[in-house]
Regions:
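Short boundary/linker motifs that mark transitions into or out of structured domains
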Residues: 1-33, 115-121, 313, 484-487, ...
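DNA-binding patch around the recognition helix
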Residues: 2-8, 41-47, 63-110
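Short amphipathic alpha-helical recognition elements used for nucleic-acid or partner binding
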Residues: 26-58, 436-437
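Conserved adenine-nucleotide phosphate-binding loops and their immediately adjacent elements
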Residues: 111-144, 241-253, 353, 413-421
């Protein structure tokens, strides 16, 4: 801002040339020093002005003036009607200083000082008219979209165009006008910026930036409350807004959060927030955006819920290439869910308007405008730089307040470069030689940069850098001020930005390769020191600096940290990108133990997002963990050997390759015994116990699961991340409940399942709760408790739908549909079981397929589709033979016997073994023999496994058949032997039925 302009904010007018503040038409009296404080704050609007800076600027030669700013601020607030706790104009920033926060409108005065006339002002913050000539239609369209948003119809607008076409100027002018009434209009404006080089790897970068800025502003506590209530997974990504204790709690509870949940949460926040205020959300430079941000844009755009939301995204069409934004934008635009506002060059009339505004006293605009329009094709950036160049060459000059063109427009032609690039390069060459190194180093630091970063690149004092940058800002040459940063080590540094990314790119191209490498490395090292323990927050940025600085080992290290950040946000594609880039960096390093260790860390981590994006059966998952295992054996690091083995174990276990999974589990256990860390043994016992359970080795499974549970210390392991995201305690208790039921301890099984549910609820950990609910629903299914099965399955499905857990949703669907068939519902439930099975397999899961096929077959039998049921059972046995999955084998043989009778014995009721009312024809001998063979096979398998509950159920089926054959003694002997073993669970359906049959048999024998 120049020193003699008139500035308006709200109803006030600050007349700088006449040193006067007016409220409406009335002057507002202020002491000279108080006016000077207001002037300084307005001149530095939007950035933090420290108390020390104010004292230096307003009281430069006065001792003991440290308390003077406070008095002036109090007087200003009284004069402006402002409140410290709810500021509209002047915000107190902690103990540091003040910030002027009201939107400003500048009235251009014709009498400007000569030096200010020579150089264009900061076009990022300048008044709308000079930079927005010719954009009235586009501006009006944005305002129409805002009006529709204010009435509850969400709007999404993509502002597109080539570099320099004026996207940012248009949007900034619109936002300034939209917020001109201040927040009393009920409009909140959030801004986020995508960053070149590392922005594509930072999940939700512009969204988190916008939310963080909005929630951190005074008076915006509403948003923080809504984040706590509706979007804890987002709040966990904004550590500056919460205490360390709250952050730790959030991170623990949010392990395993899914992308679907994050999208749902932000949708909930937008819905709740926009019932209170209207929200304008700007995301700039989406051509550098990440996958997750694009997913969010799609989700927000496609939602049909009312919301007072206007989302504006800017991007360069020419820079899209194969960026994923291209198909996303095409999809939304083709369905009319978003609108595009493409910017072309401005017209010759608009060029003339610009000249008349910029040079208020002149007579050349009509002659010069067509020529400038032809030269620049209406590109605003080219136009402004060309005019700057004409002023610098004094072809446009001022005398006695009048601007004149010293040559005819045609005489300028030979001096105009062929494009804006050449023109900017001419301007760069005119920069004083002593200032050029500062701009070169700044360009390596980024489009926006901290003075401290440039100081580290040049090994200079930051004060000197700030002086040089401020000199360029005053001249409005390439740079503008952006505010003040405070780094974690307490470093306070001014932040600057290039007026346009093109300037930064051209200055960066001037830097020789060797110097560029040194600059990147020094900047990375300085930021690394300053961030200390919080260095992970800028991992993606550091990865770029060290990569460009040829420090490949450190670059790979920060790619790993950036991948971990991405995984915390469930951004699996970004995590894969970081990890693959890290592995590529390591290929440039010699084969050393350190390199091997780094690759091992990356490969172990890579398996997680690969599984999430490609499924359990993906060969890429196996390759990652196999390579990790090879590397871990080279470095002989026990913990990492176990991690790699567990990764492979999960891969083969979920695929149903149980013999391989068993071997891996045994190796895990063997390795874990060599390490003092109990969590390794806990995981190894759990993995082996789970595997043995499905192999039908129930006693051994129980032993391992109990040992795993004995090692589990909730206090110690609550923050421990194991091979998956299920809490270790829940992961032990739930399968242990199954093992106990199979072994004939139904009461103990129910108790352990209840403990798993209680622990999952206590942890408030959704994935663990989904695990516990699914296992509990299946346990009720084992127990023939249809109502409880349905209730638990419906709870599972609700949680899985809300959180985005496809595995639990598929299993819940199968179990609920089975229960509904058992309770008398129709054939549509059979289709739902099939759909659940298809969804289950689509994830890449095979484990448990035999059990689900058995449930489907049983439901077919219940609905009278016996032949279909028998075909499904044949499929289940084929799967069991291939995988070794034997947990449900006895039940499959029993069901085969029941369905055989149902098919071949008229009137047979498989659920009771009784005949339908009416005549009871004798059963064919061959049918009886076939059914007996299946029942006896079921009993034999159950006895081999010591699966008393499966044995009891098979014995009930066979004894009912023998009752029909009048083999009462044999039936009684068989069933009483099995029933007599049980010591608990006598109120469960199977044991109650067995007791009823035994009483019937006894009565028959004594009759």
């Amino acid at each position: 801002m120049t020193l003699d302009q008139t500035v308006c904010f709200s109803s006030f007018r600050l007349d700088l040339p006449n040193q006067q503040l007016c409220g409406g038409a009335q002057p507002v009296p202020l002491r000279p020093k108080t006016f000077a404080v207001l002037r300084y704050l307005v001149e530095h609007a939007g950035r933090l002005v420290t108390r020390e800076e104010l004292v230096k600027a307003v009281w430069p030669d006065t001792r003991g003036a440290e308390s003077a700013p406070k008095r002036c601020i109090l007087e200003l607030r009284a004069a402006l009607g402002d409140q410290a706790d709810d500021p509209r104009f002047i915000e107190t920033v902690g103990r540091f200083g003040y910030r002027f926060i009201a939107p400003l409108t500048t009235v251009v005065d014709s009498a400007q000082v000569a030096d200010a006339q020579r150089f264009p002002q900061d076009r990022y913050n300048e008044p709308p008219l000079p930079t927005l000539a010719g954009r009235e239609a586009e501006l009006a369209q944005l305002h129409r979209c805002l009006e529709q948003a204010l009435h509850g119809t969400r709007q999404v607008v993509f502002v597109t165009g080539e570099p320099g076409i004026g996207k940012t100027s248009l949007v900034e002018t619109f936002l300034q006008q939209a917020g001109a009434g201040g927040e009393p209009r009920g409009i909140w404006i959030g801004r986020g910026q995508c960053i070149e080089h590392y922005g594509e790897g930072e999940p939700y970068l512009p969204v988190l930036e916008a939310l963080g800025r909005l929630a951190g502003r005074p008076g915006h506590e509403l948003l923080l409350d809504l984040l706590r209530r509706y979007a804890p997974s987002w709040l966990a990504q904004l550590p500056a807004l919460v205490t360390a204790g709250e952050l730790e709690t959030l991170q623990r509870r949010l392990q395993g959060v899914t992308p679907q949940r994050m999208l749902r949460e932000v949708a909930d926040v937008i819905r709740a927030l926009t019932t209170e205020v209207a929200l304008v959300l700007l995301m700039e430079d989406l051509h550098w955006s990440d996958y997750s941000t694009l997913d969010l844009v799609s989700a927000v755009t496609q939602s049909r819920e009312p919301a007072r939301l206007l989302l504006i995204g800017t991007y360069r069409i020419t820079d899209l290439g194969d960026h994923p934004l291209r198909p996303v934008a095409q999809e939304l635009l083709s369905h009319g869910q978003a609108r595009e506002l493409p910017l072309a060059g401005i017209t010759a009339t608009a060029v003339e308007q610009y000249l008349e505004t910029r040079f208020s006293k002149q007579a050349f605009s009509r002659r010069l405008a067509p020529f400038l329009h032809r030269c620049t094709e209406g590109n605003p950036l080219f136009l402004v730089n060309l005019i700057d160049d004409l002023v610098a060459q004094e072809l446009l000059s001022q005398a006695d307040g009048l601007w004149t063109l010293r040559v005819a427009p045609e005489g300028i032609a030979a001096r105009v470069p062929e494009n804006s690039r050449r023109l900017i390069e001419k301007q760069m060459a005119r920069v004083a030689p002593e200032l050029q190194p500062f701009l070169e180093a700044a360009s390596i630091a980024g489009v926006e940069f901290a003075a401290e970063s440039v100081a580290s690149a040049l090994r200079a004092h930051s004060e000197r850098i700030e002086e040089r940058c401020d000199e360029l800002v005053r001249q409005a040459r390439f740079l503008r001020r952006m505010g003040v940063d405070e780094w974690p080590d307490g470093t306070q540094t001014t932040r600057y930005g290039f007026h346009h990314a093109v300037y930064q790119q051209l200055w960066a191209e001037r830097v020789p390769s060797g110097r560029r490498q040194r600059f990147h490395r020094r900047i990375g090292e300085r930021q690394e020191r300053s961030y200390g323990r919080r260095v992970g927050e800028i991992a993606a940025e550091l990865a770029v600096h060290f990569d460009e600085g040829r420090d490949y080992a450190r670059a790979a290290q920060y790619r790993c940290r950036a991948a971990q950040n991405a995984l915390q946000r469930s951004a699996h594609r970004e995590a894969i990108d970081h990890l693959m880039k890290g592995l590529q960096l390591l290929e440039r390093l010699p084969d050393t133990p350190q390199r091997t260790q780094q690759e091992l860390t990356l490969q172990i981590l890579l398996g997680v997002p690969l599984t999430a994006t490609k499924g359990y059966a993906a060969p890429e998952v196996e390759r990652a963990y196999t390579r990790a295992l090879q590397l871990s054996e080279q470095v002989q690091e026990t913990a990492q050997i176990v991690q790699a083995l567990l990764g492979l174990w999960v891969y083969y276990f979920v695929r149903g390759e149980l013999q391989t999974a068993q071997r891996l589990g045994e190796r895990c256990l063997q390795q874990s015994r060599q390490a003092p860390a109990t969590e390794l043994a806990l995981d190894a016992h759990n993995a082996l116990g789970d595997t043995l359970l499905w192999l039908g080795e129930l006693t051994a499974a129980r032993e391992h699961l109990q040992q795993s549970l004995a090692l589990h210390d909730p206090g110690q392991h609550r923050s421990y991340v194991s091979y998956d995201v299920t809490d270790p305690g829940v992961g032990c208790l739930s399968p242990l409940a199954w093992a106990l039921w199979c072994l004939g301890y139904p009461d103990q099984a129910v108790k352990r399942s209840a403990e798993a549910l209680a622990l999952a609820h206590e942890l408030a950990h959704p994935y663990s709760l989904g695990y516990a609910l699914t296992f509990a629903a299946a346990l009720h299914c084992f127990c023939r408790q249809e109502r409880q099965t349905q209730e638990r399955a419906e709870a599972t499905m609700a949680l899985a739908s809300e959180q985005g857990f496809p595995l639990w949703l598929a299993m819940g669907t199968i179990l609920r549909s089975w229960a509904l068939v058992e309770r008398g519902q129709g054939d549509e439930r059979l289709l739902q079981i099939r759909q659940g099975l298809s969804a289950f397999q689509a994830i890449g899961a095979e484990l448990g397929r035999t059990a689900f096929l058995a449930l489907l077959a049983e439901s077919y039998g219940k609905r009278g589709q016996t032949e279909a049921g028998l075909r499904v059972l044949a499929e289940a046995l084929a799967v069991a033979d291939k995988s070794g999955e034997r947990l449900y084998e006895a039940e499959i043989h029993r069901l085969k016997g029941e369905l055989t009778l149902h098919l071949k014995a008229p009137g047979w009721r498989p659920e009771t073994g009784a005949a339908a009312p009416g005549p009871k024809p004798p059963l064919a001998k061959t049918v009886v023999q076939e059914a007996e063979r299946h029942f006896l096979k079921a009993i034999a398998v159950a006895r081999e496994q010591q699966a008393r509950s499966w044995e009891l159920r098979a014995a009930i089926s066979l004894s009912r058949l023998w009752r029909r054959q009048r083999k009462i003694a044999e039936a009684h002997a068989l069933l009483s032997a099995v029933y007599g073993w049980f010591t608990e669970g006598f109120d469960t359906p199977d044991l109650k039925e067995a007791k009823t049959l035994l009483r019937e048999f006894s009565n028959h024998r004594t009759a």
